[in-house]
């Protein structure tokens, strides 16, 4: 269990138990730079959302690995030296089709920020799609993994140059039909 300043919870028997020996690598879900550095200090992998641009990616990758080298006190069986980013992946035959789909993906981000940021949701009353359609919310991150095969390939090469260890793709985001 845990008894802390801000919250407490009773001990639980977590099932299923990992059968792998040693224990599988540990990861921390990270939403900002400080949580990425916390993962490095704990000697575990950092799983984050996409960054704003490749320069920021490079800075965060370098900060993670520098902190890992200098300060890591592993909490697991071994160090998991990986920074991974979650990104949307939608491959389209043309730039115009990608732009049309990209707007629908932005709705997913708008919804995410609504529920975990600024929103005041009222079930049965709040229409996120209507609110999004009327909003002037600005999306400041790169969407290079939404586009033509050439654009996506170029984006992945930039992530590679920035030193990113892994990228995890999500294809089910936004107001997109199964056929799309």
Could you tell me what each predicted segment is?
Residues 1-15, 55-164:
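An alpha-helical appendage that flanks or caps ligand/catalytic pockets
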Residues 4-7, 31, 171-173:
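Short, well-ordered beta-to-alpha junction loops that form the rim of enzyme active sites
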Residues 8-9, 13-14, 18-31, 37, ...:
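Aromatic- and glycine-enriched pocket-lining scaffold segments that form the walls
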Residues 26-29, 44-49, 81-88, 167-169:
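Hydrophobic faces of well-ordered beta-strands that scaffold small-molecule active sites
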Residues 32-61:
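A conserved active-site cap/scaffold subdomain adjacent to cofactor or substrate pockets
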Residues 35-36, 57, 93, 175-178:
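Short catalytic/ligand-binding loop motif for oxyanion handling, primarily in non-cytosolic enzymes
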Residues 51-54, 170-180:
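Glycine-rich, proline-tolerant flexible connector loops at the mouths of alpha/beta enzymes
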